[in-house]
Every structure is written in C-alpha cells, then in structure tokens.
C-alpha cells in the first residue's frame, strides 16, 4: 500500500529513539499520521510544505513517511511572534479536531492562502480568521452570521448568541447584551463570503476571542493548552 501527495506538517512528536510520529494535512486524503525516521537534516517544523510518500502493508496500519521539504515555514513565521502563534494555534486545532483520513480540500486550500499571505508579508489576519471559521463549519458547528436569528433582519447585526452561534440584531439583543458576544464586522463579512479590507489588530483580537470560545466549546474541550495560548495571543495584539 503506497500513496504520494503534498502535505503541510501539522505536528511531530518523538516515537522511540529513531522515529517521529508525523501528522500532515493533505488536500485529497485529509489529516494523516505516520512514522518518519529521525535524520541529521533540519527537523520538520509545523507549517512546512512537504512531498510525502506513505507506505504500509495495510491501509489500516500506521505506516511510514518519507518526506522532502518543498517550502520551509521558518522564514515566513519564526520572525513574527504573533504570526508564529497563529500558525501554532491552527495546526494544533486541525491536528486535534479533524478526523483522520477525511478529505477537507477547502480547509487545505484556505491554509495555503494563509501561508501565501504570511510568506509574502501581505495582510493575513482575514485569511487566518477564515481558517478558523472553516474548521467550525466543516466539522458541523458553523456560525450563522448572515441574519438575525429572531427577526431575520440583515441590518445592525451586533451580537452573537453563545448558545446557538447565530447573529442577533441590536434591537433584539440589546436587552440581553451582557449575556451575548459582540459580532465584529470582519467576522460577518468573511462568514458571508464578502471581500473586505484587512481588519485592525483590535478587531482581529476580538474575533480570535469569539472564535476561541466556540472552538473550545465544540471541539477542544479536552485540550489543556488552547485557552491559555489564546489568552496569550490576544494579549500580544493589545
């Protein structure tokens, strides 16, 4: 049993004295794991784009990878702490929440858009927010930010219900505002597929707090590090 595909490194951890357990995201095969030998070459890092060949006797076996790095993530992320923390966050989210062997080509393509913007030193906040929104929607927990859940109005949408993940208008939500989450304009635009200019650092931080709430609630309750790392990230953004 053998296949070959491009993939993005989602994580590595030691496995015995001579191997690493490697997790990669591929476009056509989804999240895949396998063993790869430790070498004297530069170690694989999260975000690396690799040409991966997987081999095993049976498709249900863990299998082994042989890998060639096509594009290193080092220079795109490791000089910018916020960018690096976002890379660490999304790879942790996807390697933890995505089921193995289930293709999510839209997620893969969105990650590549984020990576391209990061490498080009272009505005990348919106690309990252789209990634986290896609994780929620692809796994069945999409936020509905297109209209008010009560009145169906598309105007003055200022709140999100923490229970349903649906938008509420100012008129409907004002009396309950202390129990609701704010709705940043950029999240609504991205969720509805509307092109918009890159958000500010403050709006990015607020959006990360909101998405972090839903990601933890639905997908990452067993993660002991996600909430703390999200607090650090939003704190760096001011």
From Swiss-Prot:
Protein name (database record): DNA repair protein RecO
Matching Gene3D superfamilies: Recombination protein O, C-terminal domain
InterPro entries: ARFGAP/RecO, DNA_rep/recomb_RecO_N, RecO, RecO_C
Keyword DNA repair: yes
Known role: Involved in DNA repair and RecF pathway recombination.
Family membership: Belongs to the RecO family.
NCBIfam families per UniProt: reco
Gene: recO
GO cellular component entries: bacterial nucleoid
Keywords for this protein: DNA damage, DNA recombination, DNA repair
Pfam families in alphabetical order: RecO_C, RecO_N
Gene Ontology biological-process entries: DNA recombination; double-strand break repair
Keyword Cell membrane appears in the UniProt entry: no
